[in-house]
Amino acid sequence: MDKLFNSRLTRPLTLNTFIIDNIYENPYKIREYALNQTYEHHSYHPGVRTNNIYMQPELYALLEKTFLSYNLKINDIHNYFQYNTADEYTWIHHDNVIYGEETYAGIIYLTPNAPILGGTAMYKYIDGNMNKLDTDLLQNKPNIMANAKDSSKWLKITQVGNIFNRLVIYNSNNYHSSMEYFGNNIQDARLMQLLFIYVKPL
């Protein structure tokens, strides 16, 4: 059986964002699997995405070990593949939250030699609002939604480059977006494995 991972954890970028480079031992095998999945359009995100699909037990175990080191226990993980082409657009947002659980997102970049600026960025709104909890406290969701596509209203506080076989994990309550899209089809587009990770403190 092939070894699945090279699990080298890098220094955290911020309290809420960290990276594992060279996550898969054989990333082209995972990429080939992703290329052969069925993708569908949905109204709530750009690009096309698979349904929630089977997750490799080894990946689950690695994530479980990683989050335990932060005193967090995984309750569930939703696992998808997604790709976006250059003719699509994105917006700044936070992900849906299950109350009583903290939610993290994970992205594994699966396009070889991708543009470095095709990664992921975290943002702060002009009023200092950084996440859904701030938005609820300040009761300014209408302003946030109205300006989700206006970059002049946001300050970029972290960005992560699109490096093949890199996993980035971040707190999905925080405002974020993909950066540049690229490519024309699944073969050369921004292909990724997308994880939504639901955790609770130990």
Regions found by a protein language model. Give the residues of each.
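Non-heme Fe(II)/2-oxoglutarate
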Residues: 2-94, 119, 126
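Catalytic core of non-heme Fe(II) oxygenases with the double-stranded beta-helix
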Residues: 87-202
